[in-house]
Amino acid sequence: MVIKPGNGEKKVVIVGGGIAGLEAARVAALRGYTVDVYEKEDVLGGQINIAAVPPRKDEILRSVAYFECILPALGVNIHLGTEATKEIMNAADAVIVAVGAHDLMLPIPGADGANVVSSWDVLAGKAEVSGHCAVIGGGLVGTETAEYLLEKGCTVSVIEMLDKIANGESSTILPTIMADFKAHNVAQYVNTKVSAIEAGCVKATQGEEEITIPCDMVVMAVGSKKNMLDVEGVNVPVYYAGDCSGERTASIAEAIRGGYKAANEI
């Protein structure tokens, strides 16, 4: 990817220290701009820190380590535990918003129960689960969360609306996941739509049949929605990168591409 020469001396503020924001900072710095990254959490990486928790995934943290090494060398100022105020943004010549996304919960009866948690909270250590867990959503996050739960000693069922579990998973990893599921007797419900959550079970429809799936806990892994940042009153050009841009960034490569693109437009 070609990094264009900068358009004069500019100060760029990056809001968000996930992979997209960090790549945007790298590219902006290489273009000769003064760059400040503001991350409200105490660590860089954003959702990578959650994605690295399931089995075999910790290697992806090397992407964060790379940016932690290269950005200071490029003169990028990193502000952890700090939110970018509108005053900070207006003091820059351009702002790149890279504030990520948040996980979704199904709007069905029982979804607000004490026995229901999100996969992101489970992986982040914010929610404790035990016993028989029903994971709603058999995509990448759902299957990886299921493996994590197996590692923690839980019994797991995976419920997926489509006709295949782990659709889109790497062909090198999928056989390992399926073997793990088989070894732990993971019940897989495909073509199954959840209609309600009750104490001790999930109600669902599989084809024309109404079924009941027993469980102690329900873990939601049904996708994400972009975060919004209030930029009303920000009077400098604002660009977007990563999940919050509305573009799907389901991989590190896509997040990097989004960060590069945003920084190259300034």
Give the location of each predicted region.
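Ferredoxin-type iron-sulfur electron-transfer modules in oxidoreductases and energy-metabolism complexes
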Residues: 1-6, 71
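Rossmann-like dinucleotide/flavin-binding elements
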Residues: 5-40, 44, 79-87, 91, ...
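Rossmann-like dinucleotide-binding cores of NAD(P)H-dependent redox enzymes
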Residues: 37-74, 146-192, 246-248
